[in-house]
Amino acid sequence: MFTTLATAVVRRPGRVIAAWLLVLAALTAATFAVYEPEGSRSTDSQADFLPDRYESVKAAEIGSRAFPDPDGSSAVLVVRRADGAPLTSADQARIDGLPQQLQVAGVTSVTPGAVAPDGRLRLAEARLAGEADAEESIDAVGRLRDATDDALAGTGLVAGWTGEAAGAADGSLLDLIVHGGMMLVILVLLLVVFRSPAIALLNLLLVLMVSQVATSLLTLGGEVFGYELDSSTKNLLPVVLLGIGTDYAVFLLFRYRERLRAGDDRRAAMVHAVSRIGGAVTVSALVVAVAFGALLLSRIGSFQVLGPALAVAVLLMVAAALTLFPAVYSLLGRRAYWPAKLVDPSAGRTDDAGATGPAARAARLIARRPALVAVATVAVLGLLGLGTLHHRSSYEIDRLPPGSESAEALDWLRSGLPAGTLSPTVVYLTGPGVDRVAAERFAERLAEVPIVAAPGGVEVEGGVAQVQLLLAEAPYSQRAMDAVKGQLRPTAHAAAPPGTRVYVGGETATYADIQTVLDEDLRLVFPVAAGLIGLLLLLMLRGLLVSIGLLAAVALGFAATLGTSVLVFQVLGGQSGLNFQLPLVVFLFVTAIGTDYNILVVARLREELRAGRTPRQAAAEAVRRAGPAVAAAGVILAGSFGVLVASPTMAQVGLAVAVGVLIATFGLSWLLVPALAALTGRAAFWPARTRSRSGAVPKTGPVPAPSEAVVPAETMV
């Protein structure tokens, strides 16, 4: 099948490239035609992503009907004296006059707000016409900051803007830097691996092209099917596509280079390359897609969108890797690798005893001491995995770029006002007879709950009362969520007048409900994803023991990754816990990508067994020949995720996935899996056949690489 596909591609490469360009142009044009700048198909409201039966969701629905929020977004101004002294009456008068001085484009209103109990700072709120992450809002925040500086110049007052719109404005520049850094890392690593500027630049261009196709397709899908993309999906999608797309290109280009070195012409070399890697890469992509697709079983809406979106994107990327990439590189031939010389590094060598490089050294170690390698690898990964015993989840999603104005202003606010000022908990009281008197009496009872630092106001409209409460703890902290579930909700329901109903909502209550749902999701998604991956492995490898072994290996890799993350962020970094999404995201990435790389190594190992090698020889040869391509792909993918460490909201996910990919690459694919295969031998592939059809006695010296080889014999460059 892949030979037929490759032959068709290299015969008409221009048509293949034109078809992809046509698809890109059509989807991009359609996306712009339906694009809604207000971001109605993008949301970060977690209440939108929970099942309807949860109390926080019901509270949000009641609030949106009875007390609809104005369109757009908001930013909060924090004003204080430069000398830290309490605000004077003259200072207060200047702040009262700010609304007239801050009427800039994109801002609908500015309203003076609360004064801190110690009188040292005061708030003001600006309403913006656009959504927080819209370009017009980012520009409006910039104008607000300039106007504020002008208005307070020489007054002895200093101010900073924070809140959702200001945080988005500060994060937008960092996002550009992160994505630019990611592309730079990939460019540099491709240059190191292939020593070809053409490959580095062209590969990045092709991957970005396919990424645009995927993004446009998902955007159009949102318009047709009504799903919404949150910031996690939008942040992860380009990272995944850049990393995985580069992976597939590396596998193709390694094999293509080997055949060009062997003397094949550019078309024959590409047909050979695609026919040999096509099956393994396709199955690997299916494993990744199935792992991501398992998120459909989650009851959290953001995961239900994230998983299928990534699955579709990965399948598009593998389609490009088998059509678009071969078409482009078959046209270039040897010129793609310029200025590197395509000389076979193994030419004239009759044995691999003198082979150098990490892969060759690892191969010799596995051939001589497979049991030692297996035990040592399991021990190291097991020790790292012990960190999972101390894992705690964190729901603190309000991380702002360190050193930014929004982060500094938030620190000022928290020093003088309750921690929950920017994210009040909202309690709704509904039913006949609900009036202001009943609502205020109800609010007084709620204010006695220990977690409540201060009431935030009472409103009554159409038989619905809204009571805002400012919590004493940070709204996304575990203490706040525990208190809302264990103290505030029971008290609110008990204090409700007869015949009325109570709904506790707000961000803290929403994340308390998410915590409950997520715990149940983890117990469902983990085993289902593992089972589906195991089934795919069994169908592809046709070996029971090897399939079970690969699953066990990637599970150990996941535990080691999560344990390392606990060590880095909780123990060394002093953070309260790991992002609540991290275990599920890391499990899927490490399991899928770890399996992906292992498939390539195991496929090569099985071919070496069929060529007549002993299990130890086959394991060593698989590492020596497949190891460099896997290492190059793993390092590039880890590098692309590692850049996310610069993002305050994605740092944990970025580092964890990068560590997990490196563990999967070197700990599993280079060491543990080949060592276990060397120990178990041909029995690992039962009931599939692995013996040479000719019945030849296994050779003690090296044999020519079989034609079915997955990746070339290279040393890491």
Each language-model region and where it sits:
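Structured non-transmembrane domains adjacent to transmembrane bundles in polytopic membrane proteins
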Residues: 43, 52-74, 82-162, 390-577, ...
